[in-house]
Amino acid sequence: MLTATAQKKHRVAIDFERPSLGNLDLRCGANLLITLAGKIAKKAIYFLTLWQQFFIAMNGQGKLYFRYGTMGSAKTALLLTQAYNFEERKMQYLCMKPIIDNRENANVIRSRIGIERACSWIYPEMDLYEFLKSEFERTLEVKAWVLVVEAQFRTKEQVDQLARVVDDYGVNVVCYGLRTDFQSHVFEGSLRLFELADTIDEIKSTCSCGRKTIINARIDSNGDVVSDGNQVEIGGDDKYVALCRRCWRARRIESAERNALQFHDSHSE
């Protein structure tokens, strides 16, 4: 038998262990406050991003750049040098390249001289405006510079999306790419960049004859200039050579005559 004092202590212990309705209300209230605080924080981040977007857009500092040149004109090296300078100055930037350029088999941009930087992939059907908007919201900061390599492979719509990023966020978007393909026809992305870019710069390089290169000639395994084929065929020095217009025309004629002679010889035997 418990004494009266022991029974009283036992009842107090039981009451202490048993959660009261008041304690449950406090716990539920705390959980509700935590959930509510999380939602408020998300809204605050969203409106902060919108305010940052509005403030930057009002300043109107962003520009769309198109820097074009033939293959081997150091376009990629210039982009990577620009990225290095941003890092030195603690400036925010983002590098991007098309998934079609899989020569490195990795999400890096690498130049012929060996320097490289990590980058984000650009897929054929990607909405670049929505991607960059999500990237800015995810990192809680608007990148001051977006650097795009192989910009000639972008669609007309994607170039429009990049221009919208410039206008809405005040971001500087710098596109590096080719002007024309191996048949001297302007790429879709390049044409749209010529139409929309605020600043257009030519990166010049020299043909073996001393003139300025303007044609990205495609060559076969024998070094002959190719005149037919798909517009897009990824390759380096083994498939392309930058030529001036005169040398390109001369080599096309030489290649055509040589191929015609070989065809004639093979059928006359």
Identify what each model region corresponds to.
Residues M1-I14, G38:
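Ser/Thr-rich, low-complexity intrinsically disordered segments
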Residues E141-R154:
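Conserved P-loop NTPase "ATPase switch" module shared by AAA+ and STAND
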Residues N59-E135, D181-R192, S205, I234-H264:
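Conserved P-loop
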Residues L36-A37, A41-A44:
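Cationic, amphipathic, low-complexity segments that mediate targeting or membrane/lipid association
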Residues F16, Y46-F47, F54-F55:
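Aromatic (phenylalanine/tyrosine) cluster motif
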Residues H10, R18, Q52-F54:
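Cationic, low-complexity basic patches in intrinsically disordered or flexible, solvent-exposed regions
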